[in-house]
Amino acid sequence: APDYNGYYDLIPEGFDFCDRVGARLAMNIFWYQPGSRARNSKCPLYVSVCMRDTVAPAKKTLKYLSGTKNVEYKKYDCGHFDIYVGSDFEEAITDYQNFLYRTVPVK
């Protein structure tokens, strides 16, 4: 997926980073589909759908959400890791906070 190397932008400068994972991950990663369980959630969900995502494609994410109750989502014009940095992050974090303020009010 073209987005895969975007996670490098999340690593702090000067951080001693080991770019490896255990081989056992390869046997599970292709079947890991957290969105497939969204339908079973009993709590309110907020989902950020990155429309240019090549790691977790938006079309599949939207399909999972179509039958989910108590879900709110927003489409962002960015890739998978773009939403964690820069202006995409600023927009998304504001949306996350607003969702929390509405669904988990603090008195």
Name what the model sees in each region.
Residues 1-37, 43:
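Alpha/beta-hydrolase
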Residues 78-93:
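Catalytic histidine-centered segment of alpha/beta-hydrolase-like enzymes
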Residues 95-106:
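C-terminal alpha-helix
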Residues 58-62:
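Short, surface-exposed alpha-helical segments at coil->helix boundaries
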Residues 53-54, 81:
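Glycine-/small-residue-rich active-site loops that bind phosphorylated ligands and cofactors
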Residues 41, 47-49, 53:
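Short beta-strand/loop motif that positions the catalytic acidic residue
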